[in-house]
């Protein structure tokens, strides 16, 4: 039961950090490449 409480308390924290970092990354990409359909660093 203690492990379940640890999981339930850690998963929301980790997912919040992950989604916050992902949102920040997307915001920064859109700041440098606004309205881009293709990104220069993805083209080969």
From Swiss-Prot:
This is Photosystem I reaction center subunit IX. The keyword Transferase does not apply. Its main location: plastid. Coiled coil: none annotated. It is found in: Plastid, Chloroplast thylakoid membrane. HAMAP family: PSI_PsaJ. It is a single-pass membrane protein. Keywords: Chloroplast, Membrane, Photosynthesis, Photosystem I, Plastid, Thylakoid, Transmembrane, Transmembrane helix. May help in the organization of the PsaE and PsaF subunits. It holds the Pfam family PSI_PsaJ. It comes from Pelargonium hortorum. GO terms for biological process: photosynthesis. One of its GO terms (cellular component) is chloroplast thylakoid membrane. InterPro entries: PSI_PsaJ, PSI_PsaJ_sf. The chain crosses the membrane at residues 7-27. The gene is psaJ. Belongs to the PsaJ family.
């Amino acid at each position: 039961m203690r492990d379940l409480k640890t999981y339930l308390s850690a998963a929301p924290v980790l997912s919040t950090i992950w989604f916050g970092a992902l949102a920040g990354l997307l915001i920064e990409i859109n700041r440098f490449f606004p309205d881009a359909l293709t990104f220069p660093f993805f083209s080969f």
